[in-house]
C-alpha cells in the first residue's frame, strides 16, 4: 500500500500559487517514481473557502506539509489558518511565505517551521524544505 503525502498550498496570488504547486510537485517526483508514495496536493487561492470546507467537514485536515502566504486577503492572515490546521494536523510541516521580510518579526505568535521570503527562489526553496521533511519523516532518500 502506498503512503500518502498530503500537501496544502494557500496563496491568494494565482500565478504564485501555480509556481509554488509546480515546484512542490517537481521536488517529490523522484520519490513518487519509486512507486511507494503518492502525492495529494490541494491548492487554494481563497483562504475563506478553505476554512469553510474544513469546518463543514467537506475536506479533511490531515496534511503532511502546508505552504501558506501570510497575507491572505479578506482580513485573514496565516495565523488564522495555521491555528485551524494545527488542531487537526499537529505534526505538519508549516512553511509561511511573504513578500515582506518584516512579517517574520510580526508573526512570532504564529506556529510555523520555516519562513520564506517570496522571491524567484522561494518555490524551489519550499520544494527543498518538503524534500528534507519527507526524508526525515519517512526515512527515505529522494536522491535520483
Task: State the predicted function of each range.
Residues 4-25:
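Conserved acidic segment of CheY-like receiver
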Residues 76, 80, 98-120, 124-128:
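Alpha4 helix (beta4-alpha4-beta5 surface) of REC/receiver domains from two-component response regulators
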Residues 109, 125-144:
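Receiver (REC) domain switch/output surface
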Residues 66, 94, 115-116:
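Two-component signal transduction core modules
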Residues 10-11, 44, 66:
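Conserved sequence signature across two-component system core domains
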Residues 28-42, 61, 92:
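A generic structural motif
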Residues 47, 57-85:
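Conserved phosphotransfer microenvironments
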Residues 29, 43-52, 77-78:
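Helix N-cap/capping motif at the beta->alpha junctions
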